[in-house]
Amino acid sequence: MALVPMVIEQTSRGERSYDIYSRLLKERVIFLSGEVEDNMANLIVAQLLFLESEDPDKDINLYINSPGGSVTAGMAIYDTMQFIKPDVRTLCIGQACSMGAFLLAGGAAGKRAALPNARVMIHQPLGGFRGQASDIQIHAQEILKIKHTLNERLAFHSGQPLEQIEKDTDRDNFMSAEEAQNYGLIDSVLVKRS
């Protein structure tokens, strides 16, 4: 079980303690850390919707440190990022791999960044299925559709031609923060807070 630091604040009504993530949520900062899976996606989506209801005109900051994970869970987060009114600024701290990189690139144009030593990795979706031959064929067709959708969205967000994305995601493709910026997955590399 991970330990979560507590923050104590003085208010006019006395002391109030928050876990660090709840305190940062008050500042419109959401952390996406670890594997992208359904429970995490539901929490991220709920936080995005909550912050939109609090102030639909103020940017939301999504900090990403993730090795990737479930495509469907990631798409729930991505679709919500695109759906809500506030811009979602994305920042890679540590790593944004696979679905993490997809979400990083899906931030608002001009508002996607990484810290200088962050790593970004894009690749094609992974899948495995066992069963009857006809069911395996159905799942193979579905993963190819998902691959095409992910590649189209990456092409849109990066400005790269679809054919280049298809080539570059055929195998694991690791990039430094600077390389990810040159590729179009992010807009800037942040060295120091201004």
UniProtKB/Swiss-Prot annotation:
The record's annotation in InterPro entries points to: ClpP, ClpP/crotonase-like_dom_sf, ClpP/TepA, ClpP_His_AS, ClpP_Ser_AS
Q: Which organism is it from?
A: Actinobacillus succinogenes (strain ATCC 55618 / DSM 22257 / CCUG 43843 / 130Z)
Lineage of origin = Bacteria, Pseudomonadati, Pseudomonadota, Gammaproteobacteria, Pasteurellales
- Its top-level enzyme class, in one word, is hydrolase
**Matching Pfam families:** CLP_protease
Q: Which domain of life is it from?
A: Bacteria
For this protein, the record's PANTHER family field holds:
ATP-DEPENDENT CLP PROTEASE PROTEOLYTIC SUBUNIT (PTHR10381:SF70)
**One GO cellular component, as annotated:** cytoplasm
* Subunit record text: Fourteen ClpP subunits assemble into 2 heptameric rings which stack back to back to give a disk-like structure with a central cavity, resembling the structure of eukaryotic proteasomes.
Name by which UniProt lists this protein: ATP-dependent Clp protease proteolytic subunit
Q: Which GO terms describe its molecular function?
A: ATP-dependent peptidase activity; ATPase binding; serine-type endopeptidase activity
Query: What role does it play?
Result: Cleaves peptides in various proteins in a process that requires ATP hydrolysis. Has a chymotrypsin-like activity. Plays a major role in the degradation of misfolded proteins.
Q: Which reaction is the catalytic activity of this chain?
A: Hydrolysis of proteins to small peptides in the presence of ATP and magnesium. alpha-casein is the usual test substrate. In the absence of ATP, only oligopeptides shorter than five residues are hydrolyzed (such as succinyl-Leu-Tyr-|-NHMec, and Leu-Tyr-Leu-|-Tyr-Trp, in which cleavage of the -Tyr-|-Leu- and -Tyr-|-Trp bonds also occurs)
**Is Hydrolase included in the keywords of this UniProt record?**
yes
Please state where this protein is localized: Cytoplasm
Coiled-coil intervals: none
Which family does the similarity line name? Belongs to the peptidase S14 family.
**Mind telling me which PROSITE patterns this protein's record contains?**
CLP_PROTEASE_HIS, CLP_PROTEASE_SER
What are the record keywords, sorted? Answer: Cytoplasm, Hydrolase, Protease, Serine protease
